Amino acid sequence: MKFKEFDKPEYFVNRELSWIKFDDRVLSEARDKNLPLFERMKFLSITSSNLDEFYMVRVASLKDQVHAGYKKTDIAGMTAKEQLKAISRQTHDLVHVQYSTLNRSLVPALEKAGLHVIFEHEAFSEKQKEFVDQYFEDNVYPVLTPMAMDSSRPFPLIRNKTLNIGALLSKKDTKKGKEEIDFATVQVPSVLPRVVIIPSEKKGHTTVTLLEQIIERNIDKLFLSYDVICAHPYRIMRNADLPIDEDEAEDLLVEIQKQLKKRQWGEVIRLEVEDKMDPRLLDILKMEFQVHGDDIFFINGPLDLTMLMKVYGIDGYDQFKEPKYKPAAVPAFQNDKDIFQVIREGDVFLHHPYMSFDPVVNFVRQAAKDPDVLAIKQTLYRVSGNSPIIAALAQAAENGKQVSVLVELKARFDEENNIVWAKMLEKAGCHVIYGLVGLKTHSKITLVVRREENGIRRYVHLATGNYNDSTAKLYTDCGIFTCDERFGEDATAVFNMLSGYSEPKRWNRLIVAPIWMKDRFVKMIEREAEHAKRGEEAHIAAKMNSLCDPEIIAALYYASSCGVRIDLLIRGICCLKVGIPGISENIHVRSIVGNFLEHSRIFYFRNGGSDEIYMGSADWMPRNLDRRVEIVFPVEDERIKEEIMHVLDLEFRDNVKAHILQPSGLYEKQDKRGKTLINSQMEFCREATERARAAKKEKKEKKRVFVPAEPAEDIIK
């Protein structure tokens, strides 16, 4: 490493513990009584979903390291075993706060709002008992598969993340003497709604319960020859980290399909049970799943809080939700010109979800239909369930255009979807590429090659986020349309590199990982340090999802020690420490957790007054810089530069949704007393709506202008 004096374990935060702090920031939104009630419930659901993925991937990976006897320490000087111990302590605390928030704050508040939630079937009224028993007979009983365990029937395979009910049974006709206890389990069917609306005791109220409570109440109907001693829900989390040997795999698609099946049956790494579970039932689960100690979570409430999103979706409670924001039209496209003409007139900046994602979809759609378009090339990492972009690409191939699509099969938890899309695109006649061996392709780029009067012209869309029309309404991302030939040449080179083995001798504008992106960033950070040493103004501002690359962090420490002012917007993991005397006193870190998920990557360097701005798909993480194909691109249009600087400025001034990293390692919200409240996300919504409205008004006024049918001088003559 270049900056060895800054490469000490005490200067870094462990990646996993930093992630837990991020989930804690999400949880703090659920606890914020200034938020609408249903939004708080949504954030609580998100913390649960986040924690599931964290265990299936990150904790699973650490457990693999322990099993393999791996003793090497991480950048913070912790072994895998030490990390697991610290993770366990902090995640148990997190889960405790989750359920305290649910039981003590949200459930009573929901009751006041007219939504009664019954989490225990013992609380049903007689009328409700009658309803749920009939509901069980009509809708649930035919779907259930009770599974017993005895000498002829081994313990059943329990699928990852499924909710199950375990029961202890005793035969009804057992003679007096020692009671024989049997075990049985039944999976709560995921094909049925987990949140069930039942008759309410109060007029004007809605009452809901959970499917597992209906099953638990009626479980004796599944075991007619037995007495049910006890029945309790449980849930397991398995290792879902896919080990794929790409060098050995003859067909990557087939290999991933094989591994996906194994994901359901990986090692059990976490067991969630009701805190009142019968110890005898718990002992059976512990033995069968080989789970002990801290890997067992005793839950004071319903298991798997992701179901709160279903409660969020119940009709009639809009007054307890944030008003739904409709992405505004993009002013540049609010005219009757075709999309290619608009791009020829100048680069176009998009800021989602404040601006609509429609121009990106229309770009591919129009290219698919345009007889002058010869080729379309695109990278796809995560796409929506019914993707209009996939449909347009398929149509383009059917229309005889050359269509090349890189579908990243290794996009975690989207592998199955991407396999389906890859097969569909191939069937339509597209050239489908699965990426480079050993590297995930995470870059976001589309190239359209069009025949025009002056010859071939290349149109490029570059972005920080996925080509996913669904998440584009929920994630904050930036993108640019351009037909600058230098970008076009580089885009062609990227696709040639992905589809063949050709790497260009030089790149005009794009910075590509893993080739030289990290080196380029380090050089730009060093350049700021040199400016600072000469007494010139030196400033770095960067926005990303996560920061954990040790070389980049060491370079930032070096720049800070030279006097460079460094402002960082890091939504998630941050392994950098602020406030280390003489090292990171000039570094300020904030994290925005709001209604939209902050996802864009923006990098600003003062460069002695010749400002440079870059955007792209890469975070400052080893996986992005060393193990993925990523693209970062410069922003050269002065008008767009101003817009991006406004984005950064507003987010650095946010005092409503921003959490500030302290030297202690804790994140704290700003003291807002006596200050004008700035919620950057709300402000961007307002600005985008106003701009779209102004552009629409201008278009109407242009149409009203009287244009003589003949030149004025001809009329006078």
Predicted regions and their residues:
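Glycine/threonine-rich ATP-lid/beta-loop region of ATP-binding domains
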Residues: P550-I553, Y557
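Cofactor-pocket helix-loop regions in the catalytic cores of large enzyme subunits
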Residues: N545
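Hydrophobic alpha/beta core scaffold segments
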Residues: R565-L569
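N-terminal localization/anchoring segments of enzymes in phospholipid and broader phosphate metabolism
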Residues: M1-I540, Y558, C562, C574-K717
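A generic "binding-loop/recognition-motif" signal
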Residues: C548, G572
